[in-house]
A protein has these predicted regions:
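Periplasmic N-terminal accessory/gating domains of Gram-negative outer-membrane beta-barrel systems
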Residues: 91, 98-107, 119-183, 188-190, ...
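A beta-strand signature from Gram-negative outer-membrane beta-barrel systems
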Residues: 167-168, 203, 208, 215-259, ...
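Transmembrane beta-barrel wall of Gram-negative outer-membrane proteins
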Residues: 274-387, 401, 419, 426-436, ...
Length: 977
């Protein structure tokens, strides 16, 4: 009972301090009749310019224009002041402004392009967006990359993750043809933090923290900012980096824009399915400001798309066999022949409502919502190798049940016929947030605040499967190594395909469903302030702030199985029609089987309930169920000092305290569940420093150090307790559980960057970074003495071999990053429309502490080579963009252990992503009255997706998603860009 009064006293003290600071600030303002300057910066076309550097050199004051092109100087004594404006691609501007006592002087400034040849940059949407991005990157204190909405939509994308992958040092985790998670600078996706307007977005996926870009349409955000280094006024999450999705804000000029696209996915290459699949995409923005003084602004961006994807997927179970002549050859113990047919709607909305109370004081209400229904059908046949006498190194997967597990020699009975199941994916996936915030600039101080809430959701009936049994008493299905000329297309005997085309042998035996959902709810409250002061005669800004973050994630999914209980083996497959006939399956490499979608079998179950027995006994006591609550209060201080000769030094320190409370279940050897709960806490101190200085004309150097954290996954903290007492060997008692005492992994980052800006618009930057990662979560086995599992009788207390995650080991990441962007407007004639946007990264890494191995492999998802080559053309009414995106091979998950047969490059090696090279292109032609016609091509190279073990010859999955061609029309009033 003493905790509640203590908590009230603590918050009362905090509120008293904030109130005291506010009273002092307002009192100082009343006593000091200083004036201010507020302004808006635009180009000659009337569009606002974001990220411009605006200064009053005589006072040493420097600010950047915000997303509305606005700037504000406060605390100015009455008099004349010369304002200087710098914006790459435009002529510099100076203007003298008179400041009167206690008044705010409003100015509207207009910049002219640097030369007539550069006028293309303000008439082409994607090119002008690049100008905006470069200027914003130049004025930032930390290393950022910015991608405005015009750049995002200048190339075709299925979701926002595809667009982000075109930035430097960005790799994607893909699934079923879609971008899911983003990995920055050689780190795993779990080292990447994602926010919307600075608010930490909850994950939509079960058991992890990573934000899934699968559900986010690309056209609903105003821009994407990737912060590759951290500062004290940002959350400490993000050792790899942080991605901020910035919602749109209303400008002084009304905004109206709409684009509609439609087309087909051409099923060429390896996966001809129904000749073509449809796609559709429509997105737009509407916004304006209201009233004579335009104090109230509103903008909304919305998008709807439909993705019809269909493909064939071959998934072998690779092995290595020794032939009679002692030759070792790749071998397949089994192989899936899969067909996917998806119909995925995706839509979203994002924007803001803002009110300008007065110059320098604005309140925002920002909102973001994205939704995808991951809906589709899957049909799967599994072939088993029934070859006796083969000498394999991984014998557990063959069709020969008499195989000796020690010698690996396959032996009779070899009688496992092909199996079949179908599945419907129907997951609802969404994320949303709403944020109320404000920024208020006083004479020599400013303060800001925000309150936000958001949710991430995955579930309903994400996976529903229909089970079939094959009643054939014999089989002649075997892997045909002699006929396999290409290990990407393993060959099997003709009997295999005769057997999967014998529906009379297959019987439907029931369904498996997973109702329920997993949801994460995030809450954020933040306040910060700053004041100007002088350090040895140099103007400085001291900033301070505090933040509280709360997270609640829970899972209530369960299994619902309906099993056939009637006479006979089941319902004959021939009861259901063949839903898809594919005469050219996988480009003719295989003969397809009889395909039954899940919908008809579920309909049969619903219509004949007496023939099936329902079992959902684990509802409420499923091993996946848990509830996790996490609280993170944080505070920071940061000081920025501007010295002479363009030297700028930023020093900061952030402190974060993390507390975790977990409710889950403990299961005894009989599967009986007992409620369980536990908690843990820790703190982190996160220093940061940034130095920027001139390195020649239009050249700069940056030196940055920062420490970040990556908190453990929810599954590592909250997985169920599972124990047993009937084991063999040294430890009779075993237990596995989540570890709430896990602490955050820390990462120390050092960056060195050189950047040079060209006279004709462009920039080159080259840098080196090094990250040292300490205490990552590692799964291990430990011995617990006198341990009593939760809910166990006292007689079971004793010594247990425990499997769980602990903080152990270390890792490092090191890389070189190069970027080049230029528009060659100085070239003669039609060549002046040419441009290039390219980047390249080489990233190495090494980790240690992995259980069962002494080597030091690369980090997961670390692709050593990444590059983008993006030629552009913008001249007159014609605008064209192309991008070649390359992600090198990377480890998807660790499998290899010391001494495994075949070594690290064999079939028991780590699981790797294939390298990925994708070409996308889009062109537009401007018509009168603001209309444009567009044509685009996505994945023009029909690039493969898949995995392999150890080396590519041990292929385990390989699928193709086909080019997608789209045509459309866009309309934007001519005063908009």
């Amino acid at each position: 009972m003493t905790e509640r009064p203590a908590l009230i006293r603590k918050w009362a003290c905090i509120m008293t301090v904030f109130l005291f600071c506010f009273v002092l600030a307002t009192r100082g303002r009343a006593q000091n009749q200083a004036g201010s300057i507020s302004g808006t910066l635009m180009d000659s076309a009337g569009s606002v310019l974001k990220g411009a550097q605006v200064s009053i050199p005589a006072k040493g004051l420097n600010v950047s224009t915000d997303e509305q092109g606005r700037f504000f100087f406060s605390g100015l004594q009455p008099g004349n002041y010369t304002i200087s404006v710098s914006y790459i691609g435009f002529e510099n501007l100076t203007k003298t402004v008179i400041v009167n006592p206690g008044e705010s002087t409003a100015v509207s400034l207009q910049l002219q392009v640097g030369s007539e040849k550069q006028s293309v940059l303000v008439t082409a949407g994607s090119a002008s967006a690049e100008v905006e991005a470069v200027n914003e990157e130049r004025t930032a204190d930390n290393l950022i990359q910015v991608m405005p909405t015009q750049t995002i939509t200048s190339l075709p994308d299925r979701n926002l993750g595809d667009a982000i992958s075109r930035m430097a040092s960005v790799a994607l985790t893909r699934n079923e043809g879609q971008a899911n998670f983003v990995a920055l600078r050689g780190g795993e996706p779990r080292l990447t933090n994602t926010t919307v307007d600075g608010f930490n977005m909850p994950s939509q996926d079960p058991g992890i923290r990573e934000f899934d870009f699968f559900s986010v349409p690309p056209g609903i955000v105003g821009s994407v900012t990737v912060s590759k280094t951290l500062s004290a006024n940002k959350d400490g999450d993000g050792i790899g980096g942080s991605i901020d999705l910035v919602t749109k804000t209303a400008s002084d000029t009304p905004t109206y824009q709409i684009t509609a696209m439609g087309g087909i996915s051409a099923m060429g290459g390896f996966t001809p399915i129904e000749n073509a699949r449809p796609n559709a995409d429509i997105y737009g923005t509407w916004g304006r400001r209201f009233g004579a003084s335009k104090k109230l602004g509103f903008v909304v961006g919305a998008q709807y798309s439909f993705d019809g994807t269909g493909y064939n997927d071959v998934e072998p179970t690779p092995d290595e066999a020794t032939l009679a002549n002692n030759q070792s050859v790749p071998w397949d113990d089994a192989q899936d022949l899969r067909t996917y047919m998806f119909h995925r709607p995706r839509y979203g909305v994002g924007g803001s409502l803002d009110y300008r109370i007065k110059p320098g004081s604005t309140i925002f209400l920002r909102y973001f919502y994205s939704f995808t229904r991951d809906s589709g059908d899957k049909s799967v046949y599994t072939l088993f190798d029934n070859t006796p006498g083969a000498q394999v190194i991984n014998p557990g997967n063959t069709g020969c049940s008499g195989t000796d597990a020690t010698t690996g020699a396959t032996a009779p009975p070899c009688n496992t016929p092909p199996r079949y199941y179908n599945q419907a994916e129907d997951a609802r996936i969404y994320s949303d947030s709403i944020q109320l915030s404000g920024t208020h600039v006083l004479n020599n101080t400013w303060y800001s605040w925000s309150a936000a809430i958001g949710a991430g959701y995955f579930g309903d009936n994400p996976f529903e499967s229909g089970n079939f049994t094959n009643t054939a008493s014999t089989t002649a299905c075997q892997f045909n190594q002699a006929a396999t000329k290409d290990y990407y297309v393993p060959q099997w005997t003709p009997a295999c395909f005769s057997e999967i085309n014998s529906p009379q042998n297959y019987f439907f035996t029931g369904t498996q469903r997973e109702p329920g959902h997993e949801e994460q709810i995030n809450l954020g409250l933040e306040g910060s302030g700053a004041f100007r002061w002088h350090l040895g005669g140099h103007l400085s800004t001291f900033e301070y702030g505090g933040k509280f973050r709360g997270m609640h994630k829970y899972n209530n999914q369960y299994k619902s199985n309906e099993t056939y209980a009637g006479a006979g083996a089941g319902i004959p497959m021939t009861t259901f029609r063949n839903n898809l006939v594919q005469p050219n399956y996988y480009n003719g490499a295989y003969k397809d089987g009889y395909n039954v979608w899940f919908g008809p079998v579920q309909e049969y179950v619903d219509q004949h309930p007496t023939e099936f027995t329902l079992d959902n006994s684990d509802k409420g006591v499923d091993s996946s169920n848990y509830s996790l609550v996490e609280h993170i209060p944080a505070g920071y201080v940061m000081n920025t000092t501007d010295f002479s000769n363009g030297i700028r030094l930023v020093l900061g320190l952030r402190a974060e305290v993390t507390s975790v409370n977990v409710h889950n279940l403990a299961f005894d050897p009989n599967g009986n569940a007992t409620p369980n709960k536990f908690s843990g806490s820790y703190y982190d101190l996160l220093p940061s420093a940034s130095l920027r200085f001139n390195a020649g004309h239009d050249s700069y150097m940056r030196l940055i150090y920062a420490r970040g954290v990556s908190r453990p996954e929810e599954s590592e903290l909250a997985s169920d307790v599972n124990w047993g007492t009937g084991g063999n060997g040294a430890y009779k008692n075993t237990v596995s559980f989540g570890n709430p005492n896990l602490k955050a992994e820390t990462g120390d980052d050092v960056d060195v960057l050189y950047e040079h800006y060209f006279k004709t618009f462009g920039v080159f930057s080259g840098g080196y970074f090094f990250k040292h990662l300490a205490s990552p979560p590692v799964q291990t086995n430990t011995v617990l003495n006198n341990y009593l599992p939760p809910g166990a009788p006292s007689i079971d207390q004793g010594t247990y071999l425990a499997t769980n995650y602990i903080n152990a080991g270390s890792a490092w990441i090191s890389g070189v990053e190069l970027q080049y962007l230029q528009h060659w407007t100085n070239l003669p004639g039609f060549l002046s429309g040419l441009g290039m946007n390219a980047n390249y990264s080489y990233i190495g890494s090494q980790t240690s502490g992995i259980a069962g191995r002494s080597d030091k492999p690369r980090l997961l998802e670390n692709a050593p080579n990444l590059f983008n080559i993006g030629p552009t053309y913008n001249k007159g009414p014609l605008s064209m963009q192309m991008n070649i995106n390359y992600n090198g091979s990377s480890i998807y998950y660790y499998q290899y252990t010391d001494g495994a047969p075949g070594g690290p490059t064999g079939p028991l090696g780590d699981n790797y992503n294939y390298p990925h090279t994708q070409v996308d292109a889009q062109g537009s032609y401007a018509l009168p009255r603001g209309f444009k016609v567009l044509v685009s091509g996505l994945n023009l190279t029909n690039e493969e997706f898949g995995f392999y073990y150890g080396s590519p010859k041990f292929d385990t999955q390989r699928e193709f998603y086909h080019p997608t061609y789209s045509f459309g029309l866009s309309w934007t009033p001519q005063h908009e860009k």
